[in-house]
Amino acid sequence: MNTYNCIADDVKLGTDVRLSKFINLYGCEIGDETKIGAFVEIQKNASVGKCCKISSHTFVCEGVVIEDNVFIGHGVMFINDSYPRATTGDGNLQTEADWKVERTVIKKGASIGSGATILSKIKIGANAIVGAGSVVTKDVPPNAIVAGNPARVLRYIEHTVEGHNEHF
């Protein structure tokens, strides 16, 4: 660790986790042999599995579950509230107690391209690939390749060879 990181006491780090500079981690769990890039924030009640790569400038909000062997590209944004508002119905500024955190799950072996936005209550299936810049508004099936705004299925991965997906 270095002096440029903010890592709260309640963070659970696995073995051989590699942390870049300028990261914020609090109340989260990071699995073994995972690499966290620069300028990443991972909030409380989020978890990242083992052997993952979370690239720079990514925001992983509360309630996101990232399983093992997942790749997250640069600048990926996770959203955890379907109806965000600044104030309550009576005009008062919302507090943490006013927000409803909605869970998002990224299944084992999935890859999310740089600049993608993943909306709340989404499940990205095992080995799925989300194209760069996509906006994911609904669940992605396992082995699907999706892209666009909103993200749509382009095709499916045919088979796996030695633990790696064959895309074409």
Identify what each model region corresponds to.
Residues 1-9, 19-122, 150, 156-158, ...:
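Flexible, glycine/small-residue-enriched loop-and-beta-strand segment within the central core
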Residues 122-139, 143-145:
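C-terminal/domain-terminus segments
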Residues 132, 167-168:
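A C-terminal cap/extension of S-adenosyl-L-methionine-dependent methyltransferases
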